[in-house]
């Protein structure tokens, strides 16, 4: 969304193709952002407003991209074909399925949640797994699914540590 907003400032009309029913991806479900604890909703609202002149397709995915001599044809899941000279593709990310690491008890015990689950709960959404009345302390386990060859992901996600610090604040 930030890239689209900047392209609009430069006089271009970007096309945003969002597979979900609203803009913002994962951030739209989060509570506050690091380092200044800005409410995530404020950022999403600001970027949505900044992108209002873009062509936006919600609940849509890119089905096929064909390279042409002077550009691309993009076929969308809704049947629309777009011809363009340039593509800036931002694919987002998938959260690691924490239940794959059974040793941490996610999906087995209450009060064992991911950073994303906790953000969603902080944002006022109910989560039956979280019982704040029984909590005396909170521990954060870093790198679950990241830097883990057995889980198929040897890279660091670059967000777990900073998110845990923000949530601890």
For each predicted feature, which ranges?
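Rossmann-like dinucleotide/flavin-binding elements
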Residues: 1-24, 65, 91-169
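Generic secondary-structure signature for well-ordered alpha-helical cores
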Residues: 9-12, 32, 49-55, 89, ...
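N-terminal glycine-rich dinucleotide-binding loop that anchors FAD/FMN and/or NAD(P) in oxidoreductases
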Residues: 28-59, 101-118, 162, 166-167
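Residue-level preference for short coil/turn positions at secondary-structure junctions
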Residues: 52, 70, 83, 108, ...
């Amino acid at each position: 969304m930030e890239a689209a907003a900047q392209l609009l400032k430069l006089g271009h009309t970007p096309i945003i193709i969002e597979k979900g029913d609203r803009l913002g991806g994962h951030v739209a479900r989060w509570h506050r952002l690091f380092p200044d604890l800005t409410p995530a909703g404020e950022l999403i609202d600001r970027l949505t407003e900044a992108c209002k002149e873009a062509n936006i397709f919600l609940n849509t995915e890119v089905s096929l991209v064909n390279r042409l001599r002077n550009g691309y044809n993009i076929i969308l899941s809704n049947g629309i074909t777009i011809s363009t000279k340039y593509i800036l593709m931002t694919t987002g990310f998938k959260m690691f399925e924490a239940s794959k690491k059974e040793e941490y008890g996610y999906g087995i015990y209450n009060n064992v949640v991911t950073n994303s689950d906790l953000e969603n709960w902080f944002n006022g959404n109910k989560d039956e797994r979280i019982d704040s009345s029984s909590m005396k302390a909170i521990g954060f386990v870093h790198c679950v699914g990241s830097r883990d060859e057995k889980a198929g992901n040897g890279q660091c996600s670059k967000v777990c540590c900073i998110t845990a610090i923000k949530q601890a604040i």
